[in-house]
Design a protein with these regions (language model features):
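Membrane-embedded transmembrane alpha-helical bundles that form the catalytic cores
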Residues: 6-265
Length: 265
């Protein structure tokens, strides 16, 4: 089908390649990352969350300026609903607030992902691409609200920390989705460890090599094969399918390694 062929010709749509500050981009590697870490390591511990959130929002706004308000709205509404679900509130009130949060978060997700599908035949909607990372920060928000509702964790009083949980740039665009109660201790207090920084740099470099040396090389092969369907043979079709599968694997694996490395650093 034409859609499948388009994806095979450009599978990078799955891995955030439209973002000007993608982890493998020149802008990220030589401008954003060095400047961010210099500031982050030099400032006092009490200000690190401020810099980390500001850097994460800048990272997202650089790539998605038109959708930054949606991310900020998700952070604010999630924080307010969590605060309202305090332990002394009645079970019915807590349940109602959870349902309200689920409707809000999933409603936003459905609106931006499927509005064109449902209403495009009736009204002329502007053609906007999907906000990068919307699924990930939406489900992170839901994870937080569910944890508060189940009393696995108290409501987060600090808006900065909750914003950091939803918008932390290493996991903002491609995940992974980490339950709030697992990440909560690190939001409150972290220590910089030389071994963590070293291991993080190594893991990031491995991921970058997977992306730049393997995935991108395979992308050229796949594009060449699926870009000329008229001369496609059984052998070249199989080669294209295998190359495409390997490209996706190294794209996702490389991105995951880079995200883990950034987190360690």
């Amino acid at each position: 089908p034409p859609g499948a062929v388009k994806i095979m010709q450009d599978p990078s749509i799955f891995v955030g390649e439209g973002l000007p500050v993608a982890f493998s981009s020149i802008s990220f590697l030589f401008y954003f990352l060095p400047l961010f870490f210099i500031i982050y390591y030099l400032i006092p511990a009490r200000a690190k969350n401020v810099v980390l959130l500001a850097g994460s929002l800048f990272f997202y706004a650089w790539g998605e300026p038109r959708w930054i308000l949606l991310l900020l709205a998700s952070i604010l509404v999630t924080w307010l609903l969590g605060r309202a679900m305090r332990p002394e509130a009645s079970a019915g009130r807590r349940r109602g607030l959870l349902i309200l949060g689920l409707v809000f978060q999933l409603g936003l997700l459905v609106a931006v992902k499927y509005a064109g599908f449902f209403f495009g035949a009736f009204i002329d909607l502007p053609k906007l691409h999907l906000p990068l990372g919307v699924s990930f920060y939406t489900f992170h928000a839901i994870s937080y609200l569910v944890d508060v509702y189940r009393q696995k964790t108290p409501p987060q009083k600090n808006l900065l920390r909750l914003g950091l949980y939803l918008a932390l740039f290493p996991k903002l665009v491609m995940g992974p989705i980490v339950p709030y109660h697992e990440l909560e201790p690190a939001l409150a207090q972290r220590t910089i460890d030389a071994q963590d920084v070293s291991d993080g740099c190594f893991r990031f470099t491995i991921g970058l090599a997977k992306k730049a040396l393997l995935a991108d090389a395979l992308a050229g092969l796949v594009t060449g094969i699926w870009g000329d369907l008229a001369s496609l043979t059984v052998l070249s079709a199989w080669l294209g399918l295998i190359g495409y599968a390997l490209q996706l694997y190294f794209d996702f694996s490389g991105y995951s390694d880079m995200a883990i490395g950034l987190g360690r650093m």
